[in-house]
Swiss-Prot record:
GO terms for cellular component: cytoplasm; endoplasmic reticulum; eukaryotic translation elongation factor 1 complex. It comes from Rattus norvegicus (Rat). The lineage of its organism: Eukaryota, Metazoa, Chordata, Craniata, Vertebrata. The modification N6-acetyllysine is found at K7. Signal peptide: none annotated. This is Elongation factor 1-beta. The modification Phosphothreonine is found at T88. InterPro entries: eEF-1beta-like_sf (IPR036219), EF-1_beta_acid_region_euk (IPR018940), EF1B_bsu/dsu (IPR049720), EF1B_bsu/dsu_GNE (IPR014038), Glutathione-S-Trfase_C_sf (IPR036282), Transl_elong_EF1B/ribsomal_bS6 (IPR014717), Transl_elong_EF1B_B/D_CS (IPR001326).
Length: 225
């Protein structure tokens, strides 16, 4: 497993392809897996790698909280496509298999205090989730206006970047280009979000992060479903 050398364009391309249908390196929330890969990259990916750039900017916003993100940080070779080997020079040794936390770990293996605490916390969370009854999910339909810099902006690429933003509770809908004057067109795009998972602030932060294409974003319409 791995991404190749994340300090090279080839490695970043592998990362971009890997994130084309994923919001995070593992699972549905930021974790130590994202931190490990983020720290292996020397800087923001180029704008044409929109999936990798979207992920990079999102994880960067967790800079102050990265130590508290869930999971156990492992070596880069533990993440990414199975068919690619990690060759990023990090100087860090691979994490030992004994460090992996097994939710149903064997009783006859010695556990560190941290590992034992983490396993107990996960078991408690699992039991808590199982006990909860399904709640009604509040959703909203949002119409966004995404404005380019000028009439030379590649609107196809702009829309591709916007749609590359993925999150649990976010579904993109139809879109169209609307003239605003002087040959400039804005992207008007519909999306449906789960209110407790996705907000307009998060959408604006991630969309405007594609600063090579996007000048600004506005909410044109907002309706509860």
């Amino acid at each position: 497993m791995g991404f190749g050398d994340l300090k090279t364009p080839a490695g970043l391309q592998v990362l971009n392809d890997y994130l084309a249908d994923k919001s995070y390196i593992e699972g549905y929330v930021p974790s130590q897996a994202d931190v490990a890969v983020f720290e292996a990259i020397s800087g923001p990916p180029p704008a044409d790698l929109c999936h990798a750039l979207r992920w990079y900017n999102h994880i960067k916003s967790y800079e102050k909280e990265k130590a508290s993100l869930p999971g156990v940080k492992k070596s880069l070779g533990k993440y990414g496509p199975v068919s690619v080997a990690d060759t990023t020079g990090s100087g860090a040794a691979d994490a030992k298999d004994d460090d992996d936390i097994d939710l149903f770990g064997s009783d006859d293996e010695e556990e560190s205090e941290d590992a034992k605490r983490l396993r107990e916390e996960r078991l408690a969370q699992y039991e808590s989730k199982k006990a909860k009854k399904p709640a009604v999910v509040a959703k909203s339909s949002i119409l966004l206006d995404v404005k380019p810099w000028d009439d030379e902006t590649d609107m196809t690429k702009l829309e591709e970047c916007v749609r590359s933003i993925q999150a649990d509770g976010l579904v993109w809908g139809s879109s169209k280009l609307v003239p605003v004057g002087y040959g400039i067109k804005k992207l008007q795009i519909q999306c449906v979000v789960e209110d407790d998972k996705v907000g307009t602030d998060m959408l604006e932060e991630q969309i405007t992060a594609f600063e090579d294409y996007v000048q600004s974003m506005d909410v044109a319409a907002f309706n509860k479903i």
